[in-house]
Amino acid sequence: MIYSIIICAGALLGLWILEKLLAPKDTRPPLPPGPWRKPIIGNLTDFPPKGTPEWLFWAKHQERYGPMSSLEVMGQTIIMINDAQLGIEIMHKKSALSQMIPDAPFAHMAGWGMSLATERNRQAWKTIRANMKQEIGTRRAISTFHPKMEIGIRRFLLRTLDNPDDLRFHIRKEANAFMMDVAYGYTIAPHGKDELYDLTQQSVRQFSHIFSPGEWSVNFFPILRYVPSWFPGASFQIKAAEYKRTIERMTMVPYLWIKDQVARGCSRPSILLRLLQKGHYESGSHQEQVLVWTNAEFVMGGSDTTVSAVSSFFVAMALYPEVQRKAREELDRVVGPTTLATFEHRSQLPFIDALVKEVFRWHPASPLGAPHITQEDQIWDGYLLPKGALLLPNIWTFTHDPSVYHDPMVFKPERFLEGKDSPPETDPMKFVFGFGRRICPGRFVTDEKLFLIACHAVSCFFISPKDPGAPEPDWLPGVISQPGAFDLNVVPRSPAHEELIRSIETDHPWKNADATDISRFMARNQMI
């Protein structure tokens, strides 16, 4: 056996040497600088170790190689973009030259082939994007959902008041409750088990694992998709099958449930219902899958970025009490000490608006942006970006560049306000949600929800660390990153504020949840 391995390795090395000797001389400009390429495998061993925050690992490339760096793995060129202005020039202003979506064999195996992150059928991709833009892609479109947002955020305050130690759970539940209501007309259970909510959470967790850069060997060696699951090293086949079962249920259960409601004459307004009524969708057709995935993208994409941003906001308020005090003073002065702000107040609250921008800058929800693929050779600053190269923007380095942001590690909303001697620093909204035609379609949902949660939380609560000497938490690795464990005290400012929070119970009593109905539907259709 060992001799066979040695012979194979020797043959591969010989072929590699022969290819180098016989290959015609390349007269094109060089690739951007990067670590030395090893024979055959290239930079396969130069990826971040498991559990390492990828954006911090790749930030070292900026220190060593400058605004652009490159790697190669099995013939695939990867260009790391470490400079915001360069990212805007290449992936936004010239987005037509790099709008293709990278191939992701594992994602397709895991049932995520229709996701915006992987769908390579241009017409399907455009349809999903167009549907999302129409429903949530502009501030005008989002304004139709303001009443739902306001009610949901007030319920979030109530849950936090009653059980502040479960703050992270409340943040996630509020974000998902809103998206599931908008997308499906679904009311989650305020307390207790909810199978559709649990299924959505499971899908979101799996999403981060599926799309984690460098995680799956089959993405580098696509031929491995044909290896049986029992073969040594092919455990990814088992994971792919598990994830596929989850996402198929998560996408199809609410769709079939709404179709059942329509048949029974008891459907409620939702994005999915509006799209369903616009056309006829054959069961099992590609058009049906486009419809189903449009709403899955609404729910999963919109909720997880919001959870990340809101979690980072609470950590920032605890670590920077002076910022919290200034925000509260502005709200008390403009809105009143025992009145809750609305979206109409935003133009009168410049410090809160700057605070929202600083949350996005301080720790972007997606520290590594969505990758793009070049569609033709491009030359930038004397370096070649070859056709088919994967462009990977390190958003974290964009937002922590000391030449753009003074004291970038410090949470300082004032950087976005007009100063007596200094103009506002660059608005991070230009790049934290992506570039060009791959920009996050749900960015306005996250922005507006963070604004109102910041207003209400600062108005009603004092936020502080349980351990006054606790350092800033680590941020967890993943496609969508969130702060690690960090215990907070969240207490009402006064009895009057507690009464204000509890007024939601009489203003908008809890609605009957759909959890029991969906559980029965799933059991009846053998979808559990």
Swiss-Prot record:
Enzyme Commission code(s) on record: 1.14.14.117
Outcome of mutating residue 423 to L: In strain: ATCC 96044 / SRRC 1273 / AF13
Pathways involved: Mycotoxin biosynthesis; aflatoxin biosynthesis
Annotated InterPro entries: Cyt_P450 (IPR001128), Cyt_P450_CS (IPR017972), Cyt_P450_E_grp-I (IPR002401), Cyt_P450_sf (IPR036396), Cytochrome_P450_fung (IPR050364)
Cofactors required: heme
GO molecular function: aflatoxin B synthase activity; heme binding; iron ion binding
Positions of heme binding: 440
Entry superkingdom: Eukaryota
Record keywords, A-Z: Heme, Iron, Metal-binding, Monooxygenase, Oxidoreductase
Main EC class the enzyme belongs to: oxidoreductase
Catalytic activities: 8-O-methylsterigmatocystin + 2 reduced [NADPH--hemoprotein reductase] + 2 O2 = aflatoxin B1 + methanol + 2 oxidized [NADPH--hemoprotein reductase] + CO2 + H2O + 2 H(+); 8-O-methyldihydrosterigmatocystin + 2 reduced [NADPH--hemoprotein reductase] + 2 O2 = aflatoxin B2 + methanol + 2 oxidized [NADPH--hemoprotein reductase] + CO2 + H2O + 2 H(+)
Pfam families attached to this UniProt entry: p450 (PF00067)
Role description: Converts O-methylsterigmatocystin (OMST) to aflatoxin B1 and converts dihydro-O-methylsterigmatocystin (DHOMST) to aflatoxin B2 in the aflatoxin biosynthesis pathway.
Family of this protein: Belongs to the cytochrome P450 family.
Protein name: O-methylsterigmatocystin oxidoreductase
Organism whose genome encodes this protein: Aspergillus flavus
